[in-house]
């Protein structure tokens, strides 16, 4: 039995054909083989923690518009395996919640019916680029954003319209056993080229999605429906302006009793239930109850919407989150306020630059007194010396200079969270050279059916 209709062609999954228990064993052995030769001293690997859900676990998906073959009908979904251009219709993908598949299908059918073209990577023309869908696991709130190019007549090319008409004619032929005449087809092309504005097009799309909810076809409900302009030539989602078509531009998710406000572009773990397992393990590793400092200063670097910062705040005097995406920082501040947390501070900036500025300020004024909260954000991001550090960097890990600055703080213990184990493996070398040793290490399967896995390492500085 196939995992999904695109099992042989899609590059999204890796372990569809084997039992989940076997997948976990493979991932555990990969982590063991990667770190065993690198870790100095005892090898404290604790194995892998399974995901609470094996499918329908993803709370975020980024789908692409395109076609499966040159000049084929409009497709919306994921890239074909080993292909930069070909897009597969993936509304039956089993990684996200089924609500996302229904939204995906409704969106594709709507724009196919309107004869709207996708953005061609080579010709740099066309309208439709990506569809971002996020859904709260605990709240059921759904946030959808259509990412598109500048609206122009080329968005409705004759080829695109002919393709949409051909699809409609096939449907009519199967349903009514009749075919549209050539003259009628030509007339329809002309009508489609002139009858709709961007405002009307987007309004119609929004209404087509809302009808899913009104007709009871979704388990969740829409928090917001948005559209985002992206005129960049890069094949990536670039936010050059987002407008609300319905509702609001954020939704809420709950983790470990806390509320988190999330926008289309906020970093947030894509497996909410798995994230709870991850963060529970981080709190266990931190175990600040028996430290010399009763209420430590904690740094959460690459903090996203401030999830770890807030979860660590209950054992901290002050917890500082540093994140480069300003939108995520604003969400983090709002999240902390809504959760009634008063000892969190969030700084918008690149981790390397913030640490360099802090180092320069400390050199000028001498070491900043422990716990001095005089500020920080208003006074050049000056931060007190941390007692404990958590880093959760992007997939490629930390910049070497940022890691050097973290090491220079000389904290007794730090936690490194890695969504790409090889990045942690690379960064272990300078950390161990500076006297840190891995005291605890585990993997968390945040991405079932894929070959990705999260790792957590607790490092402690040896006494010289």
Regions picked out by a protein language model, each given a short descriptive name:
Residues 13, 131, 420:
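Residue-level signal for inorganic ion chemistry
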Residues 151-184, 188-464:
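Rossmann-like S-adenosyl-L-methionine
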Residues 59, 140-142, 296:
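Nucleotide donor/acceptor-binding cores
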Residues 65-69, 135-137, 229, 445, ...:
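Short, low-complexity Ser/Thr-rich regulatory SLiMs
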Residues 2-18:
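Local cysteine-cluster metal-coordination motifs and their immediate loop/turn environment
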Residues 14-120, 138:
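Extended interfacial segments that mediate partner engagement and assembly in macromolecular machines
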Residues 46-54, 121-123, 129-134, 231, ...:
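Short, solvent-exposed loop/turn elements at beta->coil junctions and helix N-caps
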Residues 73-74, 80-104, 108-113, 117-166, ...:
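Upstream accessory/linker segments immediately N-terminal to the RecA-like ATPase cores of bacterial MutS
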